[in-house]
């Protein structure tokens, strides 16, 4: 099962949802063996975000954009507790759109002749990524020009963060400091047949939100959780 969530450092983190996931694993031993995807860097050194997921058995694989802001996950990466692939953030953003559109992947020059190039590390961040035999990127030659092909994958469940949701599930982001790709992730998950759970600061009645303020339409949202003020 592939699980994804948004966040850029501590901005736009669905913190209550991630904490609840951690507590459920600690108390019940499930879910487990999740394949984790995030586009950027959702965490803050040794607290918040992905650091709550740093438990052996909870995460079996990581596909992300940056690991240093999730120090506890980074420690597990160094211990080869799971395969870790670090993919350029811009590629991850485009992958969400490609997943939403049902495409097999994206073709781009981003990452050529860098660690992302399969002739070098192919986005592998630890030995476990080499040992697992999986690949996330391939080298293509089109009209005598080199490109990289990054593969898409289905997303089974995602957590996103908004400010307000109405009772129909429409989400606005008026108090969010960073506009994370919550729409792209929601569409990618929905079109994969997955579930979209949103954490918000408050709940409003249907019909009270201005249509132009809505960032994620309610038809994409499966569940709404009103979070704690300290985790907004």
Protein language model features and the residues they cover:
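Conserved alpha/beta enzyme-core scaffold
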Residues: 1-232
């Amino acid at each position: 099962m592939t699980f994804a969530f948004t966040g850029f450092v501590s901005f736009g983190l669905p913190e209550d949802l991630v904490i609840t996931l951690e507590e459920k694993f600690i108390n019940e031993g499930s879910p487990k063996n999740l394949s984790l995807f995030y586009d950027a860097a959702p965490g803050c050194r040794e607290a918040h975000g992905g650091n709550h997921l740093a438990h052996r058995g909870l995460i079996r694989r990581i596909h992300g954009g940056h690991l240093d802001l999730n120090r506890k996950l980074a420690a597990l990466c160094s211990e080869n507790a799971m395969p870790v692939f670090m993919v350029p953030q811009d590629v991850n953003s485009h992958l969400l759109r490609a997943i939403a559109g049902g495409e097999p992947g994206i073709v781009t020059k981003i990452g050529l002749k860098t660690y992302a190039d399969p002739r070098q590390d192919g986005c592998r961040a630890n030995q476990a990524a080499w040992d697992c035999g999986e690949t996330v990127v391939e080298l293509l030659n089109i009209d005598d020009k080199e490109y990289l092909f990054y593969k898409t994958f289905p997303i089974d469940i995602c957590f996103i963060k908004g400010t307000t949701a109405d009772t129909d599930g429409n989400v606005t982001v008026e108090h969010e400091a960073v506009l994370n790709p919550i729409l792209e992730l929601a569409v990618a998950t929905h079109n994969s047949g997955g579930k979209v759970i949103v954490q918000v600061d408050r709940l409003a009645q249907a019909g009270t939100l201005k249509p132009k303020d809505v960032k994620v339409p309610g038809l994409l949202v499966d569940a709404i959780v009103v979070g704690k003020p300290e985790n907004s």
